[in-house]
């Protein structure tokens, strides 16, 4: 193996250890301050791995044109260049669901299944709108007509954010221990105690490479699931659209993007490839439905 390839892989293992160390650092005995510190660490983590086309915001709310509002989102990953709309109320930010690629819930040691379910449900209730009009290269895209069947080649009919749970257990958790984790599409655990710690040679000063401190679980098994879940969230699946390449997408597993050798798993490096492949399956957000949001604001005025 080329030395620079080996060095890169080992560097990502060290980054895993550094991430866990920062998240577990006892900055204070004040819970809110500690939580704020950990959110900043997670924000920096995502900034390093997602493309620059995405912006990352902290402590925001996600809305749709039906006046639904999510619970507070610790971290939102959204496309501000493509859908440059953030509605503000003082310091509070409301981001339209059409722009949001992923939402992140950050937790520390303990997971409350009821709280996680309530939070996830507040994301799932949000619906994108197809009421958009856009000039494309060869035609005028009219979302409503497409919805009514004038164009039946649309792959992206309704998007929804990828739900990510980040938390920091002391030890690597058991896969069967749900505690609300099954409500999320991706679960990232930065556990404090690495199994390789127990195997280090205490009688030598030589640096020992470790297995890392991340465990990342995906709910989606293959790229076909990814395509359908995040681009066709309205469940109006058009078999004519996806049948041509559906078998190839189904064959390409999320697990195929893992980087590993006989003795080590490079979880962080793997996640960079896995997460960005999922983002590429979404690629661009929905065309923004300006008129639908205008109607939302106007209807509220009429109700007053």
Could you tell me what each predicted segment is?
Residues 1-72, 77-304:
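Intrinsically disordered, low-complexity Ser/Thr/Pro/Gly-rich regulatory segments
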């Amino acid at each position: 193996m080329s030395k620079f390839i080996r060095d890169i892989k080992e560097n990502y293992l060290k980054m895993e250890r550094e991430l866990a160390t920062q998240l577990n650092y006892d900055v204070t005995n004040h819970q809110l301050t500690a939580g704020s510190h950990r959110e900043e660490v997670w924000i920096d983590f995502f900034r390093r791995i997602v493309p620059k086309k995405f912006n990352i915001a902290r402590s925001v709310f996600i809305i749709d044109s039906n006046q639904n509002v999510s619970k507070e989102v610790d971290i939102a990953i959204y496309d501000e260049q493509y859908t440059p709309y953030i509605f503000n109320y003082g310091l509070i930010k409301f981001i339209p669901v059409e722009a949001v690629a992923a939402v992140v819930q950050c937790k520390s040691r303990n997971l409350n299944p009821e709280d996680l379910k309530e939070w996830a449900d507040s994301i799932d209730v949000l619906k994108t709108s197809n009421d958009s009009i856009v000039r494309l290269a060869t035609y005028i895209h009219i979302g409503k007509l497409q919805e009514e069947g004038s164009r039946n080649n649309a792959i992206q009919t309704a998007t929804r954010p990828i739900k990510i749970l980040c938390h920091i257990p002391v030890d690597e958790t058991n896969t069967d221990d749900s505690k609300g984790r099954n409500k999320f599409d991706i679960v990232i655990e930065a556990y404090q105690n690495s199994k390789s710690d127990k195997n280090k040679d205490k009688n030598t000063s030589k640096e020992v490479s470790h297995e890392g401190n991340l465990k990342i679980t995906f709910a989606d098994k293959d790229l076909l699931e990814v395509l359908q879940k995040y681009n066709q969230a309205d469940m109006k699946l058009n078999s004519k659209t996806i049948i041509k390449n559906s078998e190839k997408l189904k064959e390409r597993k999320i697990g195929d993007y893992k980087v590993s050798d006989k003795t080590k798993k490079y979880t962080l490096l793997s996640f960079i490839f896995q997460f960005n492949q999922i983002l590429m399956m979404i690629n661009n957000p929905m065309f923004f439905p300006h008129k639908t949001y205008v109607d939302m604001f106007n209807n509220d005025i009429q109700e007053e």
